[in-house]
Amino acid sequence: MAKSYSLVPLAFFTMFFVHALAHFPLDSNWYDAHATFYGDMQGDETMQGACGYGDLFQQGYGLETTALSTALFNEGYRCGACFEIKCVNDSQWCLKNVNPIIVTATNFCPPNYSKPDGNWCNPPQKHFDLSMKMFTTIAIYQAGIVPVQYRRVPCIKSGGVRFELRGNPYFLMVLVYNVANAGDVLRVYIKGSNTNWAPMTHNWGQVWHTGINLVGQDLSFWVTTSDRKALEFVSLIPSNWQFGQTYEASRNF
Protein backbone atom coordinates (compact mmCIF):
# COMPACT_ATOMS: atom_id res chain seq x y z
CA MET A 1 0.00 0.00 0.00
CA ALA A 2 1.35 3.44 -0.89
CA LYS A 3 1.96 5.88 1.92
CA SER A 4 0.94 9.51 2.32
CA TYR A 5 2.56 12.12 4.51
CA SER A 6 1.45 15.45 5.94
CA LEU A 7 4.41 17.59 4.85
CA VAL A 8 2.43 20.67 3.83
CA PRO A 9 4.18 23.20 1.53
CA LEU A 10 4.20 26.75 2.88
CA ALA A 11 2.12 27.98 -0.05
CA PHE A 12 -0.64 25.62 0.99
CA PHE A 13 -0.51 26.17 4.77
CA THR A 14 -2.80 29.19 4.56
CA MET A 15 -5.24 27.27 2.37
CA PHE A 16 -5.36 24.42 4.89
CA PHE A 17 -5.91 26.83 7.78
CA VAL A 18 -8.80 28.51 5.98
CA HIS A 19 -10.30 25.14 5.14
CA ALA A 20 -10.05 24.05 8.75
CA LEU A 21 -11.84 27.18 9.92
CA ALA A 22 -14.55 26.67 7.31
CA HIS A 23 -15.20 23.06 8.35
CA PHE A 24 -18.81 22.52 9.27
CA PRO A 25 -20.81 19.43 10.31
CA LEU A 26 -23.21 17.68 7.97
CA ASP A 27 -26.79 18.93 8.22
CA SER A 28 -28.73 16.65 10.57
CA ASN A 29 -32.16 17.91 9.53
CA TRP A 30 -34.55 15.64 7.63
CA TYR A 31 -35.83 16.76 4.21
CA ASP A 32 -38.73 15.53 2.09
CA ALA A 33 -38.23 13.67 -1.18
CA HIS A 34 -39.47 10.61 -3.07
CA ALA A 35 -37.80 7.32 -3.95
CA THR A 36 -38.10 4.71 -6.69
CA PHE A 37 -35.77 1.88 -7.70
CA TYR A 38 -34.04 0.59 -10.80
CA GLY A 39 -32.34 -2.66 -11.72
CA ASP A 40 -32.87 -6.02 -10.05
CA MET A 41 -31.86 -7.56 -6.74
CA GLN A 42 -28.41 -8.39 -8.13
CA GLY A 43 -27.85 -4.75 -9.10
CA ASP A 44 -26.95 -5.44 -12.72
CA GLU A 45 -28.30 -2.11 -14.00
CA THR A 46 -26.78 -0.10 -11.15
CA MET A 47 -23.17 -0.79 -12.19
CA GLN A 48 -21.09 1.86 -13.98
CA GLY A 49 -23.16 5.05 -13.84
CA ALA A 50 -22.58 8.78 -14.05
CA CYS A 51 -20.12 9.09 -11.16
CA GLY A 52 -17.31 7.16 -12.84
CA TYR A 53 -16.96 4.44 -10.21
CA GLY A 54 -17.31 1.51 -12.61
CA ASP A 55 -17.85 -1.83 -10.89
CA LEU A 56 -19.51 -0.84 -7.62
CA PHE A 57 -18.70 -4.16 -5.98
CA GLN A 58 -15.02 -3.86 -6.86
CA GLN A 59 -14.92 -0.25 -5.66
CA GLY A 60 -16.52 -1.14 -2.34
CA TYR A 61 -19.95 0.46 -2.78
CA GLY A 62 -21.94 -2.71 -3.45
CA LEU A 63 -25.72 -2.35 -3.66
CA GLU A 64 -26.02 0.29 -0.95
CA THR A 65 -26.31 2.94 -3.64
CA THR A 66 -28.62 5.48 -5.23
CA ALA A 67 -28.96 7.66 -8.30
CA LEU A 68 -29.79 11.32 -7.63
CA SER A 69 -32.12 13.69 -9.43
CA THR A 70 -30.76 16.92 -10.91
CA ALA A 71 -31.72 18.87 -7.78
CA LEU A 72 -29.41 16.67 -5.68
CA PHE A 73 -26.72 15.61 -8.17
CA ASN A 74 -25.02 19.02 -8.37
CA GLU A 75 -23.45 18.27 -11.77
CA GLY A 76 -21.65 15.25 -10.33
CA TYR A 77 -20.02 16.98 -7.39
CA ARG A 78 -22.40 15.13 -5.04
CA CYS A 79 -21.07 11.73 -6.15
CA GLY A 80 -19.73 9.84 -3.15
CA ALA A 81 -21.97 11.56 -0.61
CA CYS A 82 -23.90 9.36 1.82
CA PHE A 83 -27.58 9.70 2.66
CA GLU A 84 -29.77 8.24 5.36
CA ILE A 85 -33.27 7.60 3.98
CA LYS A 86 -36.52 6.48 5.60
CA CYS A 87 -39.93 5.76 4.11
CA VAL A 88 -42.60 8.06 5.60
CA ASN A 89 -46.28 8.98 5.47
CA ASP A 90 -47.47 5.93 3.55
CA SER A 91 -48.84 3.21 5.81
CA GLN A 92 -49.80 1.08 2.81
CA TRP A 93 -46.35 0.83 1.24
CA CYS A 94 -43.76 1.75 3.88
CA LEU A 95 -42.41 -1.24 5.78
CA LYS A 96 -43.03 -0.97 9.50
CA ASN A 97 -40.42 -1.19 12.25
CA VAL A 98 -37.41 -1.05 9.94
CA ASN A 99 -34.31 1.08 10.28
CA PRO A 100 -33.50 3.81 7.76
CA ILE A 101 -31.08 2.84 5.01
CA ILE A 102 -27.74 4.47 4.30
CA VAL A 103 -26.71 4.73 0.65
CA THR A 104 -23.93 6.32 -1.39
CA ALA A 105 -24.60 8.48 -4.44
CA THR A 106 -23.12 6.65 -7.43
CA ASN A 107 -25.34 7.61 -10.38
CA PHE A 108 -27.58 10.24 -11.96
CA CYS A 109 -31.33 9.99 -12.49
CA PRO A 110 -31.83 12.08 -15.65
CA PRO A 111 -34.83 14.33 -16.19
CA ASN A 112 -37.40 13.57 -18.88
CA TYR A 113 -38.79 16.87 -20.10
CA SER A 114 -41.24 15.13 -22.42
CA LYS A 115 -43.08 14.26 -19.20
CA PRO A 116 -42.93 17.50 -17.23
CA ASP A 117 -45.47 16.27 -14.69
CA GLY A 118 -44.70 12.57 -14.74
CA ASN A 119 -40.97 12.23 -14.26
CA TRP A 120 -39.85 12.26 -10.65
CA CYS A 121 -36.28 13.19 -11.53
CA ASN A 122 -37.23 16.45 -13.26
CA PRO A 123 -36.08 19.65 -11.53
CA PRO A 124 -36.76 20.92 -8.97
CA GLN A 125 -37.84 17.62 -7.43
CA LYS A 126 -35.53 15.89 -4.97
CA HIS A 127 -35.57 12.22 -5.81
CA PHE A 128 -33.61 9.05 -5.05
CA ASP A 129 -33.59 6.21 -7.57
CA LEU A 130 -32.39 3.43 -5.29
CA SER A 131 -31.03 0.01 -6.04
CA MET A 132 -33.83 -2.52 -5.77
CA LYS A 133 -32.22 -4.07 -2.71
CA MET A 134 -32.25 -0.76 -0.85
CA PHE A 135 -35.77 0.19 -1.90
CA THR A 136 -37.23 -3.10 -0.71
CA THR A 137 -35.49 -2.64 2.63
CA ILE A 138 -37.79 0.27 3.48
CA ALA A 139 -40.84 -0.22 1.22
CA ILE A 140 -42.94 -2.88 -0.47
CA TYR A 141 -41.74 -3.71 -3.97
CA GLN A 142 -45.13 -3.13 -5.60
CA ALA A 143 -45.27 0.48 -4.41
CA GLY A 144 -43.02 1.67 -7.22
CA ILE A 145 -42.60 5.08 -5.62
CA VAL A 146 -42.83 6.19 -2.00
CA PRO A 147 -42.43 9.43 -0.03
CA VAL A 148 -39.21 9.52 1.96
CA GLN A 149 -37.19 11.77 4.18
CA TYR A 150 -33.42 12.04 3.89
CA ARG A 151 -30.39 13.64 5.46
CA ARG A 152 -26.66 13.68 4.80
CA VAL A 153 -24.60 11.43 7.04
CA PRO A 154 -20.86 10.72 7.30
CA CYS A 155 -19.58 8.01 4.98
CA ILE A 156 -17.91 5.10 6.75
CA LYS A 157 -15.10 3.66 4.63
CA SER A 158 -12.45 1.01 5.09
CA GLY A 159 -8.90 1.94 4.17
CA GLY A 160 -7.58 5.12 2.62
CA VAL A 161 -8.64 7.43 -0.18
CA ARG A 162 -8.08 5.76 -3.56
CA PHE A 163 -6.89 7.28 -6.82
CA GLU A 164 -7.40 5.49 -10.15
CA LEU A 165 -5.37 6.79 -13.10
CA ARG A 166 -6.97 6.93 -16.55
CA GLY A 167 -6.48 8.65 -19.89
CA ASN A 168 -3.21 9.29 -21.72
CA PRO A 169 0.00 11.32 -21.20
CA TYR A 170 -1.64 14.51 -22.43
CA PHE A 171 -4.99 14.06 -20.71
CA LEU A 172 -4.55 12.47 -17.30
CA MET A 173 -7.83 11.60 -15.57
CA VAL A 174 -8.03 10.64 -11.91
CA LEU A 175 -11.00 8.98 -10.23
CA VAL A 176 -11.03 9.86 -6.52
CA TYR A 177 -13.08 7.41 -4.48
CA ASN A 178 -13.50 5.58 -1.17
CA VAL A 179 -13.67 8.98 0.51
CA ALA A 180 -14.82 8.91 4.14
CA ASN A 181 -16.93 11.41 6.11
CA ALA A 182 -18.30 13.99 3.62
CA GLY A 183 -17.67 11.54 0.79
CA ASP A 184 -17.96 14.02 -2.06
CA VAL A 185 -14.92 15.86 -3.40
CA LEU A 186 -15.07 19.59 -4.06
CA ARG A 187 -11.64 20.20 -5.62
CA VAL A 188 -8.40 18.40 -6.44
CA TYR A 189 -4.86 19.72 -6.95
CA ILE A 190 -2.07 17.63 -8.45
CA LYS A 191 1.72 17.96 -8.36
CA GLY A 192 4.45 16.06 -10.12
CA SER A 193 7.88 15.68 -8.55
CA ASN A 194 9.17 18.15 -11.18
CA THR A 195 6.17 20.50 -11.37
CA ASN A 196 4.29 22.93 -9.19
CA TRP A 197 0.82 22.40 -7.75
CA ALA A 198 -1.92 22.74 -10.36
CA PRO A 199 -5.70 22.58 -10.06
CA MET A 200 -7.41 19.66 -11.74
CA THR A 201 -10.59 20.25 -13.74
CA HIS A 202 -13.82 18.53 -12.79
CA ASN A 203 -14.55 16.24 -15.74
CA TRP A 204 -17.59 14.20 -14.72
CA GLY A 205 -18.80 12.45 -11.59
CA GLN A 206 -15.74 12.18 -9.37
CA VAL A 207 -13.31 12.07 -12.31
CA TRP A 208 -10.83 14.96 -12.50
CA HIS A 209 -8.37 15.76 -15.30
CA THR A 210 -5.29 17.77 -16.20
CA GLY A 211 -3.53 18.43 -19.50
CA ILE A 212 -0.09 18.50 -17.87
CA ASN A 213 2.16 15.61 -18.91
CA LEU A 214 3.22 14.00 -15.62
CA VAL A 215 4.47 10.67 -16.94
CA GLY A 216 7.62 9.57 -15.12
CA GLN A 217 7.03 11.76 -12.09
CA ASP A 218 5.90 11.00 -8.55
CA LEU A 219 2.36 12.29 -8.07
CA SER A 220 1.02 14.19 -5.07
CA PHE A 221 -2.58 15.26 -4.48
CA TRP A 222 -4.37 17.87 -2.45
CA VAL A 223 -8.05 16.95 -2.01
CA THR A 224 -10.83 19.06 -0.50
CA THR A 225 -14.22 17.56 0.33
CA SER A 226 -17.56 19.38 0.39
CA ASP A 227 -17.27 20.11 4.12
CA ARG A 228 -14.09 22.09 3.30
CA LYS A 229 -11.80 19.59 4.96
CA ALA A 230 -8.52 19.17 3.07
CA LEU A 231 -5.85 16.47 3.04
CA GLU A 232 -2.53 16.37 1.23
CA PHE A 233 -1.06 13.12 -0.11
CA VAL A 234 2.63 13.70 -0.84
CA SER A 235 4.39 11.42 -3.35
CA LEU A 236 1.53 8.97 -3.03
CA ILE A 237 2.11 7.55 -6.50
CA PRO A 238 5.64 6.52 -7.56
CA SER A 239 7.19 7.67 -10.82
CA ASN A 240 6.73 4.29 -12.53
CA TRP A 241 2.92 4.51 -12.39
CA GLN A 242 0.82 3.26 -15.27
CA PHE A 243 -2.60 4.19 -16.62
CA GLY A 244 -5.28 1.86 -15.30
CA GLN A 245 -3.64 1.44 -11.90
CA THR A 246 -5.20 2.36 -8.56
CA TYR A 247 -3.27 3.67 -5.56
CA GLU A 248 -4.56 3.75 -1.99
CA ALA A 249 -3.41 6.30 0.57
CA SER A 250 -2.63 5.32 4.15
CA ARG A 251 -5.27 7.66 5.56
CA ASN A 252 -8.72 9.04 4.94
CA PHE A 253 -10.88 11.99 5.91
Describe the function of each predicted region.
Residues 2-253:
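Folded extracytoplasmic luminal domains of secretory or organellar precursors
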